[in-house]
């Protein structure tokens, strides 16, 4: 009877190995291929959707220039922008699906093929050795216990228990990844559903109002107002061109006087409501691996697109490249504070404050400034000091107190808050990318992360809507009877579905704020 039980255990263990090697891993590879095709189809859909709703927005602009359909043109523009925002939101979910599901499955299935094959070879070799040892003991009569309590039977039971756990681990990985995808879609629906319903009702009311109101003939006052608006737009366009002349080479993608729209812009920007003030970089901001940070060189012109800094960070546009992103507020200063270098030196040589400053203090200022990690934005002088602020970082004319206070301000920049604004007009792109510091491939829950976070050097970890799964290593260790010899069927550190791997935090490139 014991021989029958051992044979059943051995065959059951081999069948699980065959299932993983012949069915699970090929099926997982097929899912990866189909998932990549799914993403390509959505990308084609998003591209066509962008072209369609861009054309719809142009039709709305044409309606805005008429006297009878201005309200309808506004409705068309808002519908176009909202649909493009929804497409951008869905693109974030699909990017998460590609990185966290498809790439993880593809990587694990390639590693698991060799891992399971090696584990099966170790198992079969150990079974043969245990069976030969038991047979020698029975032949010599040295084995007096029952066959059920032998090391051979214990090894068969333990091996079957471990391979069943490995099989469960792989199917749990597949289920958890797609639960995370469902949670991402549900989060997107809950975030945008209410505001979209309110907007749709408002659009329907405006269309109904235009149906009930009769078209009127334009009066001379209306014609005069339209003429004034057209002349004002032409004058405004000329002023903008004159403002750009002293700024150097005009970029090839200079902003048009007409309102432009992009997928990542807000509704306020698309209607021409967003403004900005011109700033100049006092030091260079080098490029980094974070795509939301805006690199620039010293002396470059930037247009700040938000009215006030957010925890020490500004969001703006680099005028030469028209690229947008975040940068420290201490790295720029107003263009009004800058004068030509020769004039600055002349004023500095005749300044009374410079005559009173000792040389040692200037040297200490320079040395202290070199120790500061980033420069502090220059403060306005009093009316009696006629010195101009030079864009060079060597500010020898500042006092020690001024430098210390600036140094303290820079080093105490708080990390920006990561709370989301859930207002009806907030349809910023999100993508719940999980931030996993020490996550097992199969033993941890999928956490959702927002792409709306500001990009500080070390942002705080967001609270996940999913409960954190605690891994209990002691519960997975099978309880053995009689302490059979340890065998490396599934050695730690090489299992692609259980190895803990650290990964850096990734910030989405859709962190732009709503520009009022």
Curated annotation (Swiss-Prot):
CDD domains: I-BAR_IMD_BAIAP2L2, SH3_BAIAP2L2. InterPro entries: AH/BAR_dom_sf, Baiap2l2_I-BAR_dom, I-BAR_dom, IRSp53/IRTKS/Pinkbar, Pinkbar_SH3, SH3-like_dom_sf, SH3_domain. Residues 200-273, 355-516 are annotated as: Disordered. Residues 249-270 have a biased composition (Low complexity). It is a peripheral membrane protein. One of its GO terms (cellular component) is cytosol. One of its GO terms (molecular function) is lipid binding. Residues 454-465 have a biased composition (Pro residues). Residues 274-337 form the SH3 domain. Residues 201-212, 238-247, 434-450 have a biased composition (Basic and acidic residues). SUPFAM superfamilies: BAR/IMD domain-like, SH3-domain. It is found in: Cell membrane. Pfam families: IMD (PF08397), SH3_9 (PF14604). One of its GO terms (biological process) is actin crosslink formation. Residues 1-227 form the IMD domain. Residues 226-236, 355-376 have a biased composition (Polar residues). Keywords: Cell membrane, Lipid-binding, Membrane, SH3 domain. The IMD domain is predicted to have a helical structure. It may induce actin bundling and filopodia formation. Phosphoinositides-binding protein that induces the formation of planar or gently curved membrane structures. This is BAR/IMD domain-containing adapter protein 2-like 2. It comes from Danio rerio.
